[in-house]
Amino acid sequence: MALFTPPSEDKDGRDRSGGGDKASGVVRTPFHLRPSLGLALWGPLVPASDNRAGLWTLVGLQTLMGAFFVSRFRALRPKLLKRDIADFPSLNRFSKTSGDMHVGPVHVFADFGGTHSFHRRAGESPGFFQSRRFVSLKRALYLSTGVVLLVQSALESARLTLLVYDPWEEQARGVRDKQFYNDVVRYYHEGVDPARFIVKDPASGNTLPVNVPEVKQGVALARAHTNARNIITRWLGPLDCKPLSSSEFLDKLEHYLDTCDFIQDMNNKRLFGNPAEVKARQKALDALIQANKENRRRIRHILDITPPRGLPLSPKAVDQGLRSIILDPDHESTEDLDLHELWSIYNPWVDLALDTSLSIKFLPTVRTPEELLGDSEDTAVEQKNPPVQIKRERG
């Protein structure tokens, strides 16, 4: 006998346990906002930290918005009107002089009377949206919004340009590469569904079996590349990526800067060492440079006051070989040399014959009795030739 227990649902058919997603097998991927220093206004539209093009696009749009609000603030300021005095007959009735007068947008001569004030009634006041207070409020909102947007754009631009090491960018790049590798492995183990994919040989055009490892690897790479080129993945990166918090970002950045300072200090100590030794080496180097300059000056002075060929030859020039070619110092060009005479005196073949002593000797091979007994009896013993010596006599 079997016992059936109905699921714990209410009258509406809803699951009371709250495990509907788990029972249906649907796994919801949590989405985390991408970090930034000045793009918090865009919320989930902020791209991944390694998407430089997307970050610069949002920075440009935010800068344009800030400039628009600042321009609206400037447009709502009180305008000064430029009038000529001749346009006011009550002020220039008996005079022919003229001049410029700057007045505000509200007539300052309303108390003096005039046709422009006939339409106004006693006790009439403008509405709230036309009042100065509302205009001032709008100007304050425009100015504050524009300044905040421009400052945030400047912060994000400084992060993208001034920071040599960005932990958020490094993490986003690493997570993106890891997702691509995991996708390749997952698609490879999933295999290829013949109903969805048809693999053909590019050379012959024949259909290939989908269970071949090479085919599975190629299809897995193609699917991983397609997933990586998805517009959402390219903009936001892996959706399940949880970026570093602000405190972790600052800790990693501080650690990087401290490491750079430590390495720089170690390099400086290795190069310079003790300050006293550095000063001593610097003084010795300066003294050596000064001595070299003095020696060059003295040598140049001696060469200037000495006639040509007045200096003795260098000791290295005197120390020559026995059959070195010695030329007359009076010869200044190759035309002054007698080639036949030089060839007869310094014949290189004669020098080679004098320096060469060649002797060739053929010596018999000496074998021990044990070696002779170990050989087979039918092995013929070759007769050894007498030693021959060839000597090349010097010519």
From Swiss-Prot:
Keywords: Membrane, Mitochondrion, Mitochondrion inner membrane, Transmembrane, Transmembrane helix. Belongs to the MGR1 family. The keyword Ligase does not apply. Residues 71-139 are mitochondrial matrix. GO terms for biological process: protein quality control for misfolded or incompletely synthesized proteins. It is a multi-pass membrane protein. The chain crosses the membrane at residues 53-70, 140-156. Residues 1-27, 372-395 are annotated as: Disordered. Component of the mitochondrial inner membrane i-AAA protease complex required for mitochondrial inner membrane protein turnover. One of its GO terms (cellular component) is i-AAA complex. This is Mitochondrial inner membrane i-AAA protease complex subunit MGR1. It comes from Eremothecium gossypii (strain ATCC 10895 / CBS 109.51 / FGSC 9923 / NRRL Y-1056) (Yeast). Its main location: mitochondrion. The gene is MGR1. It is found in: Mitochondrion inner membrane. GO terms for molecular function: misfolded protein binding.
